[in-house]
């Protein structure tokens, strides 16, 4: 599975969008200071994510978020996203996905 995610900086609320296969490891990497583009605004927390079966679909969605969605639109999406889904996922170590969670498969 592939994840498209939006991180929120706890320093100033800046948003960062990316995609990965391991969302837990990627969040830890961002918070470790090893990712140049997020180093200065650490710590980060997971604000939103979507799940895809194919990497190409996740990459397409990531580009869509980056090119077609402005910051305010992303913030509205995060505000409406159910925080419980994120907490369950982070505790699960990717062994299952909470329901109902949309998995995109084309």
For each predicted feature, which ranges?
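Structure-specific nucleic-acid interaction/processing domains
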Residues: 1-17, 21-106
């Amino acid at each position: 599975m592939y994840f498209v995610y939006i991180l929120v900086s706890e320093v100033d609320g800046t948003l960062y969008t990316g995609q990965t296969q391991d969302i837990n490891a990627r969040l830890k990497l961002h918070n470790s200071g090893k990712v140049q583009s997020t180093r200065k605004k650490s710590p980060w927390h997971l604000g939103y994510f979507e799940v895809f079966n194919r990497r190409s679909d996740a990459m397409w969605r990531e580009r869509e978020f980056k090119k077609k969605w402005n910051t305010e639109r992303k913030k509205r999406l995060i505000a409406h996203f159910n925080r419980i889904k994120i907490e369950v996922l982070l505790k699960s170590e990717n062994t299952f996905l909470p329901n109902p969670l949309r998995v995109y498969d084309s």
